[in-house]
Amino acid sequence: MTDKEQVVIYTDGACKGNPGRGGWGALLLYKGAERELWGGEPDTTNNRMELMAAIQALAALKRSCPIRLVTDSEYVMRGITEWLPNWKKRGWKTASKQPVKNADLWQALDEQVARHQVEWQWVRGHTGDPGNERADQLANRGVAELPR
């Protein structure tokens, strides 16, 4: 499938302190059009912001569609492609019977993914990928715009 036929989404999270003030950002591209999304939370973690970026980007789409979602988060990538099916089978417990961290957001992401046909792609962060760099800027904007 070409990028002209699917929505391409770049997501990123940022945190000043972990936990600390955090932001998430997403860049959505479709047929030459762009949409930027960002937000933040005063007390959060980087992993939660990475998840929020993906959740908010997918939730922003009004109807089911094919998507290529690009993330630099190994946590999100491995969680959605490797760990999630087993967490669900175990009632949101890890292999060591511990509650899954950020289960609320993993469940929200799972709900959003079910609405679409998502192809996941991992990229190394901060290596000059234009979409990833834009998502990073948006995530940092999410932090910067939090009230002090």
From Swiss-Prot:
Which residues participate in Mg(2+) 1 binding? D12, E50, D72
Alphabetical UniProt keywords: Cytoplasm, Endonuclease, Hydrolase, Magnesium, Metal-binding, Nuclease
Binding-site residues for Mg(2+) 2, renumbered to this chain: D12, D136
What reaction gets catalysed by this protein?
Endonucleolytic cleavage to 5'-phosphomonoester
| One GO BP | DNA replication, removal of RNA primer
Task: Cite the EC number.
Answer: 3.1.26.4
Q: Which cofactor does the UniProt annotation name?
A: Mg(2+)
Entry GO terms, CC: cytoplasm
RNase H type-1 domain ranges (all copies): 3-144
Residue segments, region Disordered: 125-148
Per the UniProt record, one Pfam family is: RNase_H
- Broad EC category: hydrolase
Does Magnesium show up as a keyword for this record? yes
Annotated InterPro entries: RNase_H, RNaseH-like_sf, RNaseH_domain, RNaseH_sf, RNaseHI
- Predominant place of localization: cytoplasm
Q: Which residues form a coiled coil?
A: none
What PANTHER family does its record include? RIBONUCLEASE H1
Per the entry, what this protein does is: Endonuclease that specifically degrades the RNA of RNA-DNA hybrids.
Q: Which family does it belong to?
A: Belongs to the RNase H family.
What protein name applies here? Answer: Ribonuclease H
